Amino acid sequence: MPKMKSNKSVAARFKLTGSGQLKRTRPGKRHKLSKKSSQEKRNLSKQPLVDKGQVGMYKRMMLV
């Protein structure tokens, strides 16, 4: 049987922390930044944790 493949789009979007939680990036920080205030850009830089209900699904996709 061949090896299982992880979902590469999920693996690129989420990072696993040491305690097993997942961090994600906020959308809207790639382009058209001149229209956004410094405060908005700073808040977009923060990486929130994924909700508890979705963590299991994403971990299965990442084969963690």
Swiss-Prot record:
MF-aspect GO terms: structural constituent of ribosome
GO cellular component entries: cytosolic large ribosomal subunit
Skewed-composition ranges (Basic residues): 23-35
Source organism (scientific name): Chlamydia felis (strain Fe/C-56) (Chlamydophila felis)
S-S pairs: none
SUPFAM superfamilies associated with the record: L35p-like
Location of region: Disordered: 1-56
Record keywords, A-Z: Ribonucleoprotein, Ribosomal protein
Protein name per UniProt: Large ribosomal subunit protein bL35
